[in-house]
């Protein structure tokens, strides 16, 4: 793909848009970056791309800019159905995303990881498994390092491990990973998709360009993933819910075994794994299959499982105060993630939820909240919705903010109980992102008097 002299519009000026602009300019293209936001809200990125040599258009989109482009590259947060993009398509202008663009310049095999929950942990763990096996890996994508950064850079890895969101999959065309992994499909982003069918169809796109020489790693217990199997051409391996004739992982006490049909090939121990919860055993199994399919050794996979310490804001232990433990699960931005968090605790939980609703069905938490929660503290825009859904299951405290929620929870929690931030919502009503929310929670907890 030759970009030299082409007029390219990069839509969205955040991390991805800035990286796309740099990449395309490096390839000799003429680049315009378009964003509906103001220069004040975008901060230093505006001057950054201008200094690179790009034009910048802010505010309402200019139709002519889009319809006269040679190529449009959109960031994940930009809906691919907005009117200016539809008009450009009608004029024959290709509209793709950053992942599709980068993949056309990447020679190394790609391991693509998608799914509602667990994908960042799995992506990171695969990278560790590859490196522990002596195979150099670039780990990026939706995890915070756009793939175009790898495509632009001089240092090349033997394999690319990429976290891919549903929004990114909506704009792929020829993207064809050697290994595609789908962790699970549960309700999320219902504010953007027209029901679960549309969301699941987006996730299924990760497999669409694979061939029989490739590998699809699937969750056999997930009904949406199972429904995709008939349309997948790649070899299918299951990290959970494997049926007798299928290839994949079978869990037993403290270990996981890899089978193809009735034949056992290898076994991995989970005894030294520091990640807690059944969901993290599934994450380890999924990562192990993907890494093995890409050439990692069993020894390297085992070493990475033993050494991996987990990621921030994912049921991360923060501190113990007066025999009460505090956990930061800010990354839990949907209902299923909250369920997974609650499943991992035997002690009564003081649960902090809230933020910006993504269209989740909070009533699905009713039974688990009744079993596990001592109190529920609600914050942010979704406080009313969560209260309506769960007020009959647990005492609900209107906290408003995370700081107040921690204050109320500290007063109420008894020795041996736990306080868990697991919001079940996006963070954008009060914070820039889930990381900022998690850091704020940790700040408040660490400031508590002992």
Curated annotation (Swiss-Prot):
Its main location: cytoplasm. It catalyses: UDP-N-acetyl-alpha-D-muramoyl-L-alanine + D-glutamate + ATP = UDP-N-acetyl-alpha-D-muramoyl-L-alanyl-D-glutamate + ADP + phosphate + H(+). Its EC number is 6.3.2.9. It is found in: Cytoplasm. Pathway: Cell wall biogenesis; peptidoglycan biosynthesis. GO terms for biological process: cell division; cell wall organization; peptidoglycan biosynthetic process; regulation of cell shape. It comes from Desulfatibacillum aliphaticivorans. ATP binds at residues 115-121. InterPro entries: Mur-like_cat_sf, Mur_ligase_C, Mur_ligase_C_dom_sf, Mur_ligase_cen, MurD. Belongs to the MurCDEF family. One of its GO terms (molecular function) is UDP-N-acetylmuramoylalanine-D-glutamate ligase activity. Cell wall formation. Catalyzes the addition of glutamate to the nucleotide precursor UDP-N-acetylmuramoyl-L-alanine (UMA). It comes from the Bacteria. This is UDP-N-acetylmuramoylalanine--D-glutamate ligase.
